[in-house]
Regions:
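Rossmann-like dinucleotide/flavin-binding elements
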Residues: 387-418, 461-472, 481-558, 594, ...
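Rossmann-like dinucleotide-binding cores of NAD(P)H-dependent redox enzymes
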Residues: 415-455, 526-581
């Protein structure tokens, strides 16, 4: 069988796992405020089990004590026996499909917040504040150390009594255990610090207490980093020594390795590598750990496709491959490999929409798979054929909304024609992929191209659809997903009508040549403005990106904005906040941009060759209004049915003519996920 290495069973402790692929611990943000797993939580993991995964380690940063708050990211609370029946539901759901399920347990120490819920006093070995979470903390006392050690043991007991297959102790991401390990955080001079053995003592006592509570038959592992990548942090050689120390105790069944610490904004970007990173960028660190330990080594980080996973396993670098974001993108990945449907796998593109939402306090979603984590609502991963009449469906627009609408309609068995005025599919994805940091996002379009071809959809590329062209096809349903245009006309003094400003699309698509001295004005503060600034600097331009917000890129998530900074600072891009673009005028062969400080009203001028404005998208609505009055439903979507994931009532109502719906940016600008979600939840019942 192809990819045979992925399908070899593995023994971890007393546990046999059916294959070498796992979903590693991550913060899902699906538990309740009280930390109990929900139907959403269970269904999210069960879908991976249905799809054939061998092992899932759930509950990234699940807490063992109430003074390590879990509410901020809705993780699991193992500090109470109330969690046990919830675990039983989760374990049953996974086991009935042949998968194993463990949970990560931890005390976060200083890596949290104190300003809410129980308002706890946070603790760390020496009371040193963490840069990312910014929370102050106290120096943990010896009595508290022993209490927390007991908390770990009781949490492990609850996992075992709940029917889970094991626990993973988090000693990564600067949680309490590895806070004790690190000399830059642990400045203690008592038995819990100082020497190597002193710094290891807390983790050792936790491991001993857990093992004493759960016995030898229950799987216990530890997740560590391979190198903190901090000037005075733990090096790879230090981590090899630590891994060997704990492995040699004989109390660990496995070690999971992550390639970086993450208690600074810069190192946080390493932990969940986005599309700017190469494949498996930290595999060498996991392989280095494997050389010195006698237990299986697990590793995730940018392992996205079966060829890559097979190469890693066949090379003996690690014993199990974590394909965590790969399973967020497609929980049926393993099943599709077995069925010879590799080209149908929806491959993760490293957009990090999932984890960046978590760092913004939101639930984890996938940029391209709108069904992920919505299984409990009835949003399907597998589209079933309709039992109703076959319909003629016309879709206008080949961006993400249009491609998803066409795909789902074809999967339902309908006759689908898609019009796209450009010569290629992709819409704004194609434009975004031209920026230095965003090229891999084109993988979304690649998957749709393969799917639309497989489904036999009538693609009419390079064809602008007008009402006559559409109606000549005698459609039953018309879906408009024809997008919008850059909104440069909001302020007439910007001079868009006179050609004084251009859009980010103009620059990235090559419609205009990059200037040599460029001002980018960005009101959106997401990827588009930062991408065009990075693109221009890459072309050798002198660039200043200005925003009326507090800083450029402020709406970009925590694992992504650092990679922009890494790219743009060396190119000497100037990043300026709190300035509004008032007007642009020509002076000789130069442009003068007049900026006003939001708070002081003081005005500044920039003399440049080019002004690029990123001000979002204005819907293209003319086609909609041309078709609206002739449609049976007057273009209206029943939002109650849409939000409840129910069929549109008009689908079951008889009548002459066509139904009309519009989705994506031709309604209002949102994002790629929103466009795909609207298409899926609208079309799944056609």
């Amino acid at each position: 069988m192809a990819f045979e290495a992925m399908f070899q069973p593995i023994q971890i402790g007393k546990l046999t796992i059916r294959n070498r692929v796992l979903s590693t611990a991550h913060a899902e943000v699906y538990a309740t405020d009280g930390g109990m797993t929900t139907e959403r939580y269970v269904k999210y993991y069960e879908e991976k089990a249905k799809g054939g995964i061998g092992l899932a380690i759930c509950g990234g940063s699940s807490v063992v004590a109430i003074d390590s708050p879990q509410q901020w990211w809705s993780s699991v609370n193992l500090s109470t026996d109330r969690i046990i029946p919830h675990f039983q539901n989760l374990a049953d759901a996974m086991h009935k499909h042949g998968a194993k399920i463990m949970i990560q347990i931890t005390h976060m120490g200083r890596r949290s917040r104190w300003d809410g819920y129980h308002w706890p006093t946070l603790m760390s070995p020496s009371g040193i504040r963490e840069p990312v979470h910014r929370a102050t903390c106290k120096t943990i006392e010896v009595e508290e150390i022993w209490r927390v050690i007991g908390n770990y043991a009781q949490a492990a007991r609850r996992a075992k009594e709940g029917g889970l297959d094991g626990v993973e102790l988090s000693a990564v991401h600067q949680h309490m255990i590895d806070q004790f390990w690190s000399p830059r955080v642990n400045k203690r001079t008592d038995e819990w610090g100082g020497s190597f053995e002193g710094r290891m003592k807390f983790g050792l006592e936790v491991l001993k207490a857990v093992r004493a509570e759960v016995g030898e038959d229950f799987c216990v592992g530890m997740r560590i980093c391979g190198d903190e990548f901090h000037p005075d942090g733990l090096s790879h050689e230090d981590m090899k020594q630590i891994a060997k120390y704990y492995s040699d105790t004989g109390m660990l069944d496995f070690i999971g390795v992550v390639g970086s610490g993450c208690d600074t904004h810069n190192t946080l970007a390493n932990v969940i590598p986005n599309m700017t990173f190469p494949p498996e960028p930290f595999l060498h660190l996991a392989a280095g750990i494997k050389e010195v330990v006698d237990v299986p080594v697990l590793h995730a980080q940018n392992i996205k496709d079966p060829n890559q996973a097979t190469r890693i396993l066949e090379g003996g670098y690690v014993d199990m491959v974590g394909m965590t974001r790969a399973h967020i993108a497609d929980p049926h990945l393993i099943a599709k490999i077995k069925m010879g449907q590799v080209d149908q796998i929806k491959q993760c593109v490293g957009a990090n929409y999932c984890i960046d939402r978590q760092y913004q306090g939101l639930d984890v979603l996938c940029i391209q798979n709108a069904a992920t984590s919505r299984e409990y609502m009835g949003v399907p991963h597998i589209i079933e054929k309709s039992a109703g009449p076959k319909r003629k469906v016309v879709v206008v627009g080949g961006g993400p909304a249009g491609m998803e609408a066409a795909r789902v309609a074809a999967e339902r068995g309908h006759d689908v024609t898609l019009f796209e005025k450009k010569e290629q599919l992709g819409g704004q994805i194609t434009t975004a992929a031209k920026a230095p940091q965003r090229d891999q996002i084109a993988g979304i379009t690649r998957w749709y191209q393969l799917e639309l071809a497989r489904l036999g959809i009538d693609l009419r590329l390079g064809t602008a659809a007008d009402p006559e062209t559409i109606l000549d096809l005698r459609p039953d349903v018309v879906v408009l997903a024809n997008g919008g245009h850059p909104f440069l006309e909001q302020n007439e003094h910007w001079g868009a009508a006179e050609g004084l400003v251009v859009s980010s699309w103009d620059v990235l698509d090559g419609t205009v040549e990059p200037g040599k001295n460029v001002l980018v004005y960005d009101t959106i503060c997401e990827f588009s403005g930062m991408s065009v600034a990075d693109f221009l600097a890459d072309k050798g331009a002198q660039v200043e990106i200005v925003t009326d917000d507090i800083k450029p890129g402020v709406a970009i998530g925590g694992t992504t904005f650092p990679t922009y900074y890494r790219s743009m600072y060396p190119k000497e891009v100037i990043m300026t906040g709190d300035l509004m673009l008032e007007k642009v005028y020509r002076e000789g062969d130069k442009l003068v941009a007049v900026l006003e400080n939001e708070y002081t009203g003081a005005r500044e001028e920039r003399v440049v060759d080019q002004v690029v404005v990123e001000n979002g998208v204005r819907p293209d609505e003319s086609l909609y209004y041309a078709l609206k009055q002739g449609s049976r439903n007057k273009g209206q979507i029943d939002v109650e049915a849409l939000f409840a994931i129910q069929p549109q009532p008009c689908l079951s109502q008889s009548g002459e003519g066509y139904l009309l719906f519009r989705i994506g940016d031709c309604v209002a600008q949102r994002n790629t996920h929103a466009a795909i979600y609207d298409a899926l939840r609208l079309r799944k019942d056609f």
